[in-house]
């Protein structure tokens, strides 16, 4: 087979994978994340279940692909927001990134449940699928280290403990928002509006001691 023929087959296969993942998202939006089934996805696409197995051998494989795609989208949203920011101030960049994060989560609740909640019994993302999430954590660690280097934070802020606290207070508020007011806008959200206050608390907790050189 010519390279052009192989390219067409590869492209068509990727298009079918995207169609499957899109159908899975639509079904989970309507019926719940944990209720996904391969037969329902096949019906949605007008396929026979055996044909679907050529692309995904199990529904856990679909969850895995969606976890990876969601983690990639989530990271892109944060990076693009910071890249477009007209400031170098660490705390302002924090607000911008957290705003982008929370908006993305509210606009993509299915991905958010896969990434941040244990909604699917028995599902664990593969190392490949989890890699973009680890890259996002490394982005955050570097950001917090920049805050340390600029004298805004103590060194402990950029440790595993600091990362755990930061992600807990930010993702925790977004989780509360999605659980209690899933249809609210970002501007009207009772919990996400507390994100700037939560970040202030983080910076106050890890603030350098007065009079101490950093």
Briefly describe each language-model feature range.
Residues 13-24, 41, 66-70, 74, ...:
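Generic hydrophobic, amphipathic alpha-helix propensity
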